[in-house]
Swiss-Prot record:
The keyword Iron applies. The lineage of its organism: Bacteria, Pseudomonadati, Pseudomonadota, Betaproteobacteria, Burkholderiales. Keywords: Iron, Metal-binding. One of its GO terms (molecular function) is ferric iron binding. It comes from the Bacteria. It comes from Delftia acidovorans (strain DSM 14801 / SPH-1). PANTHER family: FRATAXIN (PTHR16821), FRATAXIN, MITOCHONDRIAL (PTHR16821:SF2). This is Iron-sulfur cluster assembly protein CyaY. GO terms for cellular component: cytosol. SUPFAM superfamilies: Frataxin/Nqo15-like (SSF55387). Pfam families: Frataxin_Cyay.
Length: 112
């Protein structure tokens, strides 16, 4: 994968996260704040806990930091998904789980 291909895929992922935050705020009482700075999105929940998602261009990875830990994801073209580098699942499924754990509400994130 070229750097530009990575950046395009990573941008789609971050945009999907931001759009899901808007949808979640419209549909629930989650009061979820998505703060975007360059290649990083910080999700801030009503209880002030955070999840940080950022691009790691040199490694062609997306990193996710949550209370549950730090996780690295690489894009798998065959599956069309961002997968944990240690085999712990797909990015959006994991983000949904970690956001639910941290917010105390059932929150769902998905790829576009």
């Amino acid at each position: 994968m070229t750097d530009q291909e990575f950046l395009d895929l990573a941008e789609r992922l971050l945009l999907a996260v931001e759009q899901d935050c808007d949808r979640i705020n419209d549909e629930t009482d989650a009061d979820l704040d998505a703060q975007r700075v360059g290649g990083m999105v910080t999700l801030v929940f009503a209880n002030r806990s955070q999840i940080v998602i950022n691009q790691q261009k040199p490694l062609h990875e997306i990193w996710l930091a949550a209370k549950a830990g730090g996780f690295h994801y690489r894009y798998d073209a065959a599956q069309g998904a961002w997968l944990d580098t240690k085999g712990a699942g797909e990015f959006f499924a994991n983000l949904s789980r970690y956001a639910t754990e941290q917010s105390g509400l059932a929150l769902q994130f998905s790829a576009r």
